[in-house]
Amino acid sequence: MLQITPQMRILVAVEAVDFRKGIDSLAELCRAKLNTDPFSGCLFVFRSRRATSIKVLVYDGQGFWLATKRLSKGRFRWWPQGEEPARALRVHQAQVLLAAGNPDIDATPVWRPI
């Protein structure tokens, strides 16, 4: 099962990728463009050119997980910009991003009252 823990390193690729790419192509992209070993356990997030889908790639020690989320309406409104090939996010920021939010602005509560 895919689990995102607070100790995980999360990298969001700045450039959009061709969504026909699978595990092997995305793992090579991690090595070549993001300068990170895809077997490191780091969680990698990629965006489609139209910003309607994202892919998450992670190695769990036994094999790769590749998950895709395609929005039924709208687009991912936030994506990192800049000269760097990737931007690191914290777990709560990644959760906001996966919900199509803006990790720089939208805050998720660390806990909520019951």
Give the location of each predicted region.
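Polybasic/polar functional segments that serve as interface/processing modules
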Residues: 1-114
